[in-house]
Swiss-Prot record:
SUPFAM superfamilies: Class I glutamine amidotransferase-like. The keyword Ion transport does not apply. The keyword Phosphoprotein does not apply. Its main location: cytoplasm. Transfers an acetyl group from acetyl-CoA to L-homoserine, forming acetyl-L-homoserine. Belongs to the MetA family. InterPro entries: Class_I_gatase-like, HST_MetA, MetA_family. One of its GO terms (molecular function) is homoserine O-succinyltransferase activity. Pathway: Amino-acid biosynthesis; L-methionine biosynthesis via de novo pathway; O-acetyl-L-homoserine from L-homoserine: step 1/1. The record marks 192 as: Important for substrate specificity. It catalyses: L-homoserine + acetyl-CoA = O-acetyl-L-homoserine + CoA. Substrate binds at residues 163, 192, 249. This is Homoserine O-acetyltransferase.
Length: 305
């Protein structure tokens, strides 16, 4: 089914080249159904890349989906053209009276800072609280998952001795949970982070359910409020060459970086990546949209509370 994207968003042409079905707003207005309203708070530096990664996965949906992009006022993006931000992004203050069927909050390159030291911490925690009464289900990814767990439930994060970098095997702890419908017993997820949350801290919080973990990468997914909040520590949305780009970037800067684990064919960067996470990434996002957004959201969006 199609995604309804803002007219002229760069991701439209990129995804059409991949045979992904998208339509722009002009065409969507001719279809007489209520689309699911999804807002994305994109905190990643390379915003166009992240937009494309997420939109690619959101395209596999049962209904028309209308995508909006939110930005925070207390931070200015240095890696995305200002014209792009002005055209496609809206400040939270201008969106606070809106309601949405679903929300995705991305990671951010601030994980090695204490949460309270992040310049936009006050604003983003206000958004976390706002989402609880204005969004049917919120998907927190990577740093946002750590930040949401800390803000809502007091779960701390811990520095890692070595960056968690590569593709790791995970297991499903709740096999009959709807978020895992169609999943294999084990599945693969990209990780790229310097910090972690720990299972013992998750298990101490009665409101949290630990859904998936990895013997190497640790906690992968936790849920709260009956599926109104999901906290995902990995990057299922990553495209095939994202880790390769990060690896070569850090090599070029002379930073200490290991080859991403379980990623390249024969662990040889010259042979390219072996993609093992794409199918489960699509299942994750389609299951979230279907079972926790579409099936749960009221027809009258103003009834969300």
């Amino acid at each position: 089914m199609p995604l309804n994207l803002p007219d002229k968003l760069p991701a439209i042409e990129l995804l059409k080249e991949e045979n992904i079905f998208v339509i722009d707003t002009s065409r969507a207005t001719q279809q007489d159904i209520r689309p699911l309203r999804i807002v994305i708070l994109n905190l990643m530096p390379l915003k166009i890349t992240t937009e494309t990664d997420l939109v690619r996965l959101l395209s596999n949906t049962p209904l028309q989906v209308e995508i909006s992009f939110m930005k925070i006022k207390s931070h200015t993006s240095k890696n995305t053209p200002i014209e792009h931000m002005q055209t496609f992004y809206t400040d939270f203050e201008q969106m606070r009276n809106e309601k949405y069927d679903g929300m995705i909050i991305t990671g951010a390159p601030v994980e090695q800072m204490d949460f309270e030291e992040v310049t936009y911490w006050e604003e983003i925690t206000e958004i976390f609280d706002w989402a609880r009464t204005h969004v049917t289900s919120t998907l927190y990814i990577c740093w946002a998952a750590q930040a949401g767990l800390y803000h809502h439930y007091g779960v701390p994060k811990y520095p890692l001795d070595q960056k968690m970098f590569g593709i790791f095997e995970h297991r499903v702890l709740e096999p009959f949970h709807s978020i895992f419908r169609g999943f294999d017993d084990c599945f693969y997820v990209p990780h790229s982070r310097h910090t972690e949350v720990r299972r013992e801290d998750i298990l101490k919080v009665p409101e949290l359910t630990l859904l998936s973990e990895s013997k190497d990468a640790g906690v992968y997914m936790a849920m709260a409020r009956g599926g109104r909040e999901f906290f995902v520590t990995g990057h299922s949305e990553y495209s095939p060459y994202t880790l390769d780009t990060e690896y070569r970037r850090d090599l070029g800067k002379g930073l200490p970086i290991e080859i991403p684990r379980n990623y390249y064919v024969d662990d040889d960067p010259d042979k390219g990546p072996l993609v093992r996470w794409r199918a489960h990434a699509n299942l994750l996002f389609s299951n979230w949209l279907n079972y926790f957004v579409y099936q749960e959201t009221p027809y009258n969006i103003n009834d969300i509370e």
